[in-house]
Amino acid sequence: HEKDVSVRFVDKAENIGKPDLIIIKKKKNTIGDLIFLGERDISKEILKLSRHGMMIIGICGGYQMLGRQINDPDHVESPNDGIHGLGLLDIVTTFSREKQTYQVKARMLEHGHLFPVDNELAGYEIHMGETTHNGHNSIRPFARITERAGKMVDILDGCVSASGNVIGTYIH
C-alpha cells in the first residue's frame, strides 16, 4: 500500500477527472470492453487526455484496444470480424483461438515518462492473438523479453508512442 497512490475504476467519462495516469486493461473481453468504453464516452475522454500529454498505459487487452484495429476472423470474442481501436498506437491485433500464457522476465527498452531504461521486469503474458505494427518510427518497443517459461529468448514486447505518453504491453 502506497500512501500517495490511489486507484479508481471508472465507468463514465465524467468520472475520469484529472488523474496522473490512465491504465486500460481488459475486464471481460477486449472487443466488448472497447464497445463499453465507446458507449460511455470514455474513449473520447481518453483520446482528449492523450492529446494533452496524459500518460496512458494499456496492459494486455488494454494494449490491444490502444491500436488501430482488432481483427477477430475466427469470432473468438465477437460475432463481428473486427473493430476499430482507439488509434493511439499504430498497431493491429488479430485474435486466434490459441491462448498464450507464459511467465516472463524482461528489460525495459523505452521509458516513456515512467520507467527507467534497462530496468528488469518480471510478470506474465496471457493473451490470444498477435499484435503487429507497420514498422514506422511512430512507435518503439517497450521491453525485450529475455526469459519466457524458463527459457532464454529475445522477443520484443509492446510499444511506446513517439510522444512517449502512450505505452502498451502484454506483460502483466
What are these regions (language model features)?
Residues 2-18:
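A short, well-structured beta->alpha microelement
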Residues 28-122:
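Cysteine-nucleophile active-site neighborhood
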Residues 7, 12, 103-171:
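C-terminal and late-domain segments of enzyme folds
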Residues 17-18, 52, 162:
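Residue-level preference for short coil/turn positions at secondary-structure junctions
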Residues 14-16, 93, 130:
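Residue-level detector of flexible, active-site-proximal loop/helix-junction positions
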Residues 1, 31, 160:
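RNA-binding accessory domains that recognize and position tRNA/RNA substrates
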